[in-house]
Amino acid sequence: MKPPILIIIMFTMISGTMMVLMSSHWLTTWIGFEMNMLAMVPILMKKFNPRTVEASTKYFLTQATASMIMMLSITVNLLLTGQWTVLNMNNQITSNMMTIALAMKLGLSPFHFWVPEVTQGVSLTSGVILLTWQKIAPLSVLYQISPSINSDLLTTMAMMSILIGAWGGLNQTQLRKILAYSSISHMGWMITMTTYNPTLMMLNLMIYILMTFVTFTLFAYSKSTTTLSLSHTWNKSPLIASLIMALMLSLGGLPPLSGFIPKWMIIQELTKNDMIIMPTLMAMMALLNLYFYMRLMYSTALTMFPSTNNIKMKWQFENSKKPILLPPLIVTSTMLLPLTPMMAILY
């Protein structure tokens, strides 16, 4: 893709998300979603081949269906209330329809089937945009309409997402699919907070975006897309392999890494609301997530395949490009735990 075209597409995508974030009118919110979706399709097809075409078609059909349900919800809400205001969605039917539309856009269960397939079919750079930036707009709308959302519907979808995200990633060997199921699971954790503490949901989103972005960057830097290719990383760069292992544990929510903060605060918030069974099940599912992350660690560090090369360090295969922003991002995505008391005061 030519740079001027790519710049226009990226600008359109960012503008669409910003329009959703700053809008208090349903029509401009919907237009923002459409701009975002139409800009994302060519980004997914950046490397033009049958797999990317299939992935972008699946993405387009799912997002178009979600947009239709969203527009229907907005129209019915307009007929009932006579207002276009985003905050004014007090009818239960329109609220449920909007929740389903946003769940489809986010890839929440039972509308999650497109997420692993689309992520697997595109490049790592397109995948990181799909699993990070594309979550901001739907979650911001959920944040705004959180007082009128049916908590039972949302909690059911959240628990199903955590369950699917934990089980789905167990037998995977493709790194992009593992991160897609991880995304579904993390979305479930975020959505549980929508009706209890929406601000905590946004904190969780920021930490999730940070960790996922750094993980994708390290995979792209080491040119790893499967567990087999990940096992060769130690020979090429032990430092990158060590950082990948730390990020895997952080994504799994193991203390004292950054990924533990949102899980800890969410479980604490749920127990404050006299909920015991739900956080217990969530913690048990988090163990399954941690299991497949530790399997990736095992592939990275403890399995070194036989090599005909006498030199252990394959210095000639090292990547000459040095990402400048990577060190501070790695530090923040693994070492935020000391800031937890300040976050607890804010959220």
Curated annotation (Swiss-Prot):
It is an enzyme of class 7 (translocase). It is a multi-pass membrane protein. GO terms for cellular component: mitochondrial inner membrane. Keywords: Electron transport, Membrane, Mitochondrion, Mitochondrion inner membrane, NAD, Respiratory chain, Translocase, Transmembrane, Transmembrane helix, Transport, Ubiquinone. One of its GO terms (molecular function) is NADH dehydrogenase (ubiquinone) activity. Core subunit of respiratory chain NADH dehydrogenase (Complex I) which is composed of 45 different subunits. Interacts with TMEM242. This is NADH-ubiquinone oxidoreductase chain 2. The lineage of its organism: Eukaryota, Metazoa, Chordata, Craniata, Vertebrata. The gene is MT-ND2.
